[in-house]
Amino acid sequence: GGVVVLDVAGELNWNGQSVNVAGRGFRGAGAVQWPGNADANNPPDYVATLASNQHSTKAEGIAGTPRWVFNQETSVRLDNGGTWAGYAGGDTGRGAPGNAGGGGDNRNGTRDNGGGGGGGNATFGGFGAYGWKNGGWAGTFTVADFDLRGIGGAAFASPAPARVVMGGGGGAGGNNNSGADPVNSSGGAGGGVVIVRAGSMSGV
């Protein structure tokens, strides 16, 4: 993971520089392309299994690692294998496990594809987008659309010098069944951790 620790006995002069660990935390969800119109007319759900061919995948966070994750440094989706346990109850659906973002729900394979939720850390992650609609449905949103948004990851409620965590990854968005590349619907990684202890600091 992305952890940087600086322990300086004397003065730490930043000389106008900084340490950037954006995207170095828990990995985002690797989106999955369901075959044909398998993911069609499904009710909104907080959790479902990959075997059910429903909804989008959850991200990685303090509660665990799903089967499909996304390495945004290489733009590669990683499959941990069919025997990977993943999350209890399943790796897909809008529910957010721990500080990881939930996946967007898919009401229909060709429309109503909800966006994945953002990862959480100091505060909770944001909801995903309402969802993409094709031409005949463009601009029409219903109560069901609201339920399709992936839920953002929870805030880490009790950070302390001896207890910090990386930012949760973002959930995957609905990948329409038109053959779109799942990489484009995968979630981004959360932020890493920087710990600094110094006698004094300057040049910030």
Regions found by a protein language model. Give the residues of each.
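Glycine-centric low-complexity/flexibility signal
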Residues: G1-V5, A9-V204
